[in-house]
Structures are given as C-alpha cells and as structure tokens.
C-alpha cells in the first residue's frame, strides 16, 4: 500500500488527537495554549503498547532501530560475529548508543525520530495487509539530507514511515501554534542548510520545543510552508565587507 502525503497527514491527525486527549486531558483543548510536543516515549509505550529496549545493533552504527510485528529472530553482525536478537510482537529495539551518557543529550533528536519512525511502521502495519508477511523492520542510517530515490516497496515503506514519524513528532496543528509564537507564522529562510543569525535562533527554538534535530525540523517546516529554501550561493555573510 502506497499512501499520499495528504493521507499520511490525516492518519497523524487522527492518532495524535486521540493520544492528546488521553495524555494531556483538557489542556489539549485550550485554544490559548502553546504547542504540545509529542512525548514519544509515552506515545510508544502507553498508547501503542510497544515495549522499547536498547541493544547494540551493529558494529558501525549503521542500524538505529528494529521493530517486530510478530515473534521473530533477527540476525545481526556485531564485532565480526553473528548473533541473534529474539523479538516479541510489538518489540522495539533501539541502538544502545542513544543512551550512552555522552550521547543522551547529543543524540536526543535522533533517538526521538528513530522511535517515532518505528511507531509509524507499527501504525502503518495495522493498515496494510500486504505487510503481514514481514516479521520485523530495521531502520538503517540515513546520510546526507535523508532523501532517497523511491524505486522499491521498501523505499516507499521507509518514506511513509519517515513522513508519518515526522507528522507524529511535529503535528501540523502544533507546528502552527509554535510558529505563531516563534515567527508570527511567517516562513524562515535557509541557504542550503545555513541560516542567518535571527532565523538560526528561531529554528533552534523550534528544535528545542519539539525535541528534534535541525535537519528534521527544516524538512518538516519546508513541507508545511514555514521554510523557504534558497541556494547556497545566495547566502551573503552580513559581516562580509565588499570593496
């Protein structure tokens, strides 16, 4: 099953609305409130009934997470030797590097997005009868800007999980609220991946609100019309003096 971005947004809206009512109660209905970031750990464990744990998943850090749809065994290679990870239905295993003391803060955004990605796979699995042949899913490392050519069903599955994961972490209604406070709902501007100082402060504020990386925030903001992306060469350093 291949879903459009519009359909993915509709799924996210329905899921988040239901979760917010149960988790935030009457606060979710307050029209004057600030944005409510999704507490993804509670969303995974309390709302989706997923069991989240941490293990070393690869020697080179190339696998961020695994999730299981049925009881299964997954083979991984760590330090040159093969070993098995036994997964129960609804298990999620994230790489243990996320909880190493020096990484807890540094990789917080990546950990949250990886968990949201695995949550999205579980939600999509319930909607997609074609996926019932699959026992588990792994999330590999994504380099660069995270874009990929969508050729296979697996490519589409990954794109859909990334899109739904982003919409769960940064729901459009909550992004609208945040951007009203941060920049009066006006779009930010970036040049490649660079921002002028004032917009850099604003996107960093956005990242702090939603607990996401700058790249994840930029992709989501651009998707929702809150970021204008220009070419690198259009950037002009405000401190640069021209002769």
Regions found by a protein language model. Name each.
Residues 1-243:
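Active-site hotspot residues in diverse enzymes, especially metal/ion-binding acidic/histidine motifs
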